[in-house]
């Protein structure tokens, strides 16, 4: 049993700083293995599937399609975006933040969180961000799809508790 999540895949070289500001990512559908009960097996299966996605053409192709969509009039944009949305249950994104705490105007920044953007009929967004040795999760839901988002959040906690027992 799987659900399809659209995940952004970084297209910039990791060993080189970006020459200009802005996003450079492609989107790829990741089948999330929700039917695997063992949390360790599930993590490794997600990692394996992500590795396959990063090693194929799909994220680069999606980047090109999104760039093309930006040049089209609204009906054309809607049609292209519909291709992505029709096969997607969720958007899941992971951002690696700094390993050490930042300072802003002399004050320490204790927590950082962001919210993934969802579009159209995609009713679930999960954002994951590491910062200074901690991980923050954000959950965004469409009430028609998930009227009780706290129940999903509680499951995050339960799954992490399972991992810490191993």
Q: Where on the chain are the PLM-derived regions?
A:
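A structural signal for short secondary-structure junctions
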Residues: 1, 22, 83-86, 118-122, ...
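Hydrophobic "lid/gating" helix adjacent to the active-site nucleophile
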Residues: 1-16
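Short beta-strand/turn micro-motifs at beta-sheet edges
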Residues: 15-19, 124-127
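Generic recognition of flexible, low-complexity loop/linker segments
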Residues: 77-80, 113-114, 124-127
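A short, small/polar-residue-rich loop/turn motif at beta-strand boundaries
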Residues: 88-121
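Extended, hydrophobic beta-loop-alpha segments that form or line the acyl/peptidyl-thioester binding
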Residues: 120-166
